[in-house]
Amino acid sequence: MDRIGGPKTEAPAKGAPLFDAAQLKRQTHGNPSLQVEVLALFMAEAERLMNQVEDAADPQLRAERLRALIGLSRNTGAALIAQQARALETAIASENPDLTPLRAAIADTLAYLKRTGG
């Protein structure tokens, strides 16, 4: 991943945009090398947090990891991940909340970032 490119947003059929490059640019003050670094960290951290959400037996721990994922995603421009994590956080009272939409949002966003170079 050596540059930031592609359209400002890539939206799925409905819901939040998959990725908002303008948000990333704002957060990094337009610094391309910082954008590359932030995206690399985001990609690793999003997977780590999702794994922790999936593995958490304790609802409180799951909620904490979801809040971390929401903040990370919003700051980086991964709007769909933030939206799906927020929806899951709202449904966390359920004993077995459906993690599939969030896992799919992460997979789609990471695939997009890998495909476009950011």
Regions found by a protein language model. Name each.
Residues 24-25, 29:
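Short amphipathic alpha-helical boundary/capping segments
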Residues 57-64:
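All-alpha amphipathic helical-bundle segments outside canonical DNA-binding/catalytic cores
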Residues 1-22, 33-44, 48-50, 72-87, ...:
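Amphipathic, coiled-coil-like alpha-helical segments
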Residues 69:
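An anion-binding catalytic pocket shared by soluble metabolic enzymes
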